[in-house]
């Protein structure tokens, strides 16, 4: 950890028992970052402005978090990208989970709810991952999607619509060709 980061943390971190590994980058140039007590932030993580990390959170190696709320006791695996999103209490994200936060057609992100579609007016908006949800490796969540609490997603699922609580996985057919 650089001396500059150590000095910044000494002045700005109020909580105790936070473990921040070497080569972590906390971007202080454009806004505040909040880190709760009893957190572990792995090597080469990049925490960008506007991020709130609640108590007891674990963040894996080389994960980038931008303008997101990570609620208490959530675990975010290595090499994840979490942007403009909320990860609720005790959620678990496996390695390389991605939250997409903008549309390729450059239109504002909207959110579908039971009451109808909310036009957010936001150019960038990620997703909501419900409490105690468990996401397997390489899950991708499209902008404005909601994953209900207690939902489990298997590896490589692409979340294209809101998901009610349940267990979801991809069907794969493995075919042996030749001898």
Functional labels for PLM-detected ranges:
Residues 42, 48, 52-54, 60, ...:
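Transmembrane beta-barrel architecture of outer membranes
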Residues 16-28, 67, 87-90, 126:
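Short, charge-rich amphipathic segments
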Residues 70, 76-179:
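Glycine-rich hexapeptide-repeat left-handed beta-helix
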Residues 30, 48, 65, 82, ...:
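Short coil/loop residues immediately preceding or within conserved phosphate-binding loops
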Residues 5-8, 22-26, 55-61, 100, ...:
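Short, functional N-terminal and low-complexity linear motifs
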Residues 22, 28, 37, 43, ...:
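Residues on the solvent-exposed faces and adjacent turns
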Residues 1-50:
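Extended, small-residue-rich solenoid/repeat segments and analogous flexible loops
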